[in-house]
């Protein structure tokens, strides 16, 4: 059984999230998703949707076998619990693939790191930021 981990904020779900999770699922048999807690999102605007609600929405998506919130203090706790064969990063996530692989090795976690491919949106709104911008353009 090949276990795959995907992770992210997953605020205001959109087709880009589904593309990412579908591709991640195709890399294994089980897809486990770690949803970032609001307090740990420091590289961009904080999420609009509460933590548990974002986790629940992700858990309801067809490719997802399990979804959990990330640990408040230690990024590696859920990864150790899941014991994945591969961690798939989103095409636009800020993580450095090589540094993450080094950190996993330092933590004694043996898994590969892959990156999902970018998708052509065909005019679909594929980012939370673009959704928020569109709401402001149309409704504010």
From Swiss-Prot:
<dbReference type="GO" id="GO:0006747">
    <property type="term" value="P:FAD biosynthetic process"/>
</dbReference>
<dbReference type="InterPro" id="IPR014729">
    <property type="entry name" value="Rossmann-like_a/b/a_fold"/>
</dbReference>
<dbReference type="InterPro" id="IPR004821">
    <property type="entry name" value="Cyt_trans-like"/>
</dbReference>
<dbReference type="InterPro" id="IPR024902">
    <property type="entry name" value="FAD_synth_RibL"/>
</dbReference>
<comment type="subunit">
    <text>Homodimer.</text>
</comment>
<protein>
    <recommendedName>
        <fullName>FAD synthase</fullName>
        <ecNumber>2.7.7.2</ecNumber>
    </recommendedName>
</protein>
<feature type="binding site">
    <location>
        <position position="92"/>
    </location>
    <ligand>
        <name>ATP</name>
    </ligand>
</feature>
<feature type="binding site">
    <location>
        <begin position="14"/>
        <end position="17"/>
    </location>
    <ligand>
        <name>ATP</name>
    </ligand>
</feature>
<keyword id="KW-0285">Flavoprotein</keyword>
<keyword id="KW-0067">ATP-binding</keyword>
<keyword id="KW-0547">Nucleotide-binding</keyword>
<dbReference type="Pfam" id="PF01467">
    <property type="entry name" value="CTP_transf_like"/>
</dbReference>
<dbReference type="GO" id="GO:0003919">
    <property type="term" value="F:FMN adenylyltransferase activity"/>
</dbReference>
<keyword id="KW-0808">Transferase</keyword>
<dbReference type="GO" id="GO:0046444">
    <property type="term" value="P:FMN metabolic process"/>
</dbReference>
<keyword id="KW-0548">Nucleotidyltransferase</keyword>
<comment type="pathway">
    <text>Cofactor biosynthesis; FAD biosynthesis; FAD from FMN: step 1/1.</text>
</comment>
<comment type="function">
    <text>Catalyzes the transfer of the AMP portion of ATP to flavin mononucleotide (FMN) to produce flavin adenine dinucleotide (FAD) coenzyme.</text>
</comment>
<comment type="similarity">
    <text>Belongs to the archaeal FAD synthase family.</text>
</comment>
<keyword id="KW-0274">FAD</keyword>
<feature type="binding site">
    <location>
        <begin position="9"/>
        <end position="10"/>
    </location>
    <ligand>
        <name>ATP</name>
    </ligand>
</feature>
<dbReference type="GO" id="GO:0005524">
    <property type="term" value="F:ATP binding"/>
</dbReference>
<dbReference type="InterPro" id="IPR050385">
    <property type="entry name" value="Archaeal_FAD_synthase"/>
</dbReference>
<keyword id="KW-0288">FMN</keyword>
